[in-house]
């Protein structure tokens, strides 16, 4: 058993716990079968969740979580009030258990501790690790996270590599793109209200397509990007085979996902179309029915929209401020509602931007801040 810390944006913690519970039994045990191990207890702290579970399950959270930022494995804990004490404990780190590469990066965070000078801590860590042949680099494939709070040090090794919100498909972007994990939180709220996964989605302010791509891939693990733990010396043997992905035969991937993306900016639609090609490489298991339109969403005509037999949801993070007036946003949603029989809508917007519909009613709302801006994630249903 090991202890993992799954980090996420502030105020995502409970949603992350819910997400991990939802995919827990999709993960694989060492015999190549869906795990039979029970969902562990979670310790929820600001910025993430601490979980005690088998190594092979903690590592796989990287594949499945759409809300997490990264997954760390705890490798050492100790009291640190003096630099010689800190250096001695750092020398005892069992890094050779996990990694061969002797180049490592170190990230340090301190709070309410006697040892709080980052440069001195870096020097002490450099001296300690060099004795084991490790070299500290500003950039390295392996990252060590040192957190000292109230003189208690926790040392963790990154298992993710790049931030998990970097799925691999969102390369072409415009102004102020929404992060993938924030778009995924929007999708999670849709499935609170609509248990049927057979839904069509439309975004009248689609930009480079992140909201739509996250709806399509929400239930599909991301096997097609690099993760740090796949290079660990002690990674589970079941992942040594080049065909290990085929073991996840029970994962049900969506087919013929109906998506409509609309934007007044031709460049935004061009970016979306480029990203759709990358999406197909990242998630080859998913087949999309993607329709894009360069159009003003306040002037759409019914014949421009694809007909569907599925419930239709709006998912959107409309531009605001100088890029689009509040009245135009309101008009676009009301106009779309007049053209399509909407089952619901999930809108991410500043708290100063009022959103409403004719027939849909506000069902739930999440308040949070993003880069200092107070936002609301509002869900509307019939």
Regions found by a protein language model. Give the residues of each.
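Residues in the short beta-alpha loop(s) of Rossmann-like NAD(P)-binding domains
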Residues: 12, 265, 351
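Short beta-strand/turn micro-motifs composed of small residues
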Residues: 8, 263, 349
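C-terminal catalytic and target-recognition region of SAM-dependent MTase-like enzymes
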Residues: 295-382
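SAM-dependent Rossmann-like transferase core, predominantly class I methyltransferases
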Residues: 155-191
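A short, flexible beta-alpha/helix-coil linker loop
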Residues: 111-113, 163, 320-323
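Catalytic cores of enzyme domains
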Residues: 129-140, 144-167, 206
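Conserved S-adenosyl-L-methionine
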Residues: 178-298
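Non-catalytic nucleic-acid substrate-recognition regions in nucleic-acid-modifying enzymes
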Residues: 2-140
């Amino acid at each position: 058993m090991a202890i993992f810390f799954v980090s996420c944006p502030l105020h995502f913690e409970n949603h992350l716990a819910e997400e991990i519970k939802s995919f827990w039994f999709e993960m694989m045990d060492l015999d190549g079968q869906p795990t039979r191990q029970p969902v562990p207890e979670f310790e929820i702290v600001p910025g993430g969740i601490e979980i005690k579970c088998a190594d092979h399950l903690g590592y796989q959270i990287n594949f499945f979580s759409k809300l997490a930022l990264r997954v760390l494995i705890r490798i050492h804990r100790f009291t640190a009030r003096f630099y010689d004490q800190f250096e001695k404990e750092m020398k005892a780190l069992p890094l050779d258990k996990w990694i061969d590469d002797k180049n490592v990066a170190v990230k340090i965070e301190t709070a309410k501790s006697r040892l709080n000078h980052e440069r001195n801590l870096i020097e002490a860590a450099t001296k300690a690790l060099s004795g084991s042949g490790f070299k500290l680099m500003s950039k390295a494939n392996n990252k060590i996270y040192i957190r000292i709070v109230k003189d208690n040090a926790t040392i963790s090794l990154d298992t993710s590599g790049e931030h998990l919100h970097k799925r691999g498909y969102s390369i072409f972007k415009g102004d102020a793109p929404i992060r993938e994990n924030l778009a995924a939180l929007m999708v999670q709220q849709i499935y609170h209200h609509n248990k049927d996964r057979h839904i069509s989605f439309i975004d009248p302010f689609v930009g480079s397509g992140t909201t739509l791509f996250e709806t399509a891939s929400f239930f599909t693990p991301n096997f097609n990007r690099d993760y740090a733990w796949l290079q660990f010396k002690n990674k589970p043997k079941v992942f040594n085979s080049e065909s290990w992905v085929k073991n996840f035969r029970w994962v049900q991937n969506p087919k013929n996902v109906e998506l409509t993306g609309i934007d007044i900016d031709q460049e935004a639609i061009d970016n979306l179309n480029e990203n759709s090609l990358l999406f197909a490489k990242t998630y080859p298991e998913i087949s999309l029915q993607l329709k894009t339109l360069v159009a003003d969403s306040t002037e759409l005509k019914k014949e421009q929209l694809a007909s569907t037999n599925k419930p239709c949801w709006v998912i959107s993070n409309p531009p605001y401020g100088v890029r689009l007036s509040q009245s135009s946003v309101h008009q676009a949603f009301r106009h779309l509602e007049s053209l399509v029989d909407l089952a619901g809508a999930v809108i991410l917007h500043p708290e100063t931007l009022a959103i409403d519909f004719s027939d849909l009613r506000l069902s739930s709302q999440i308040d949070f801040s993003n880069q200092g801006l107070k936002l609301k994630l509002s869900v509307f249903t019939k």
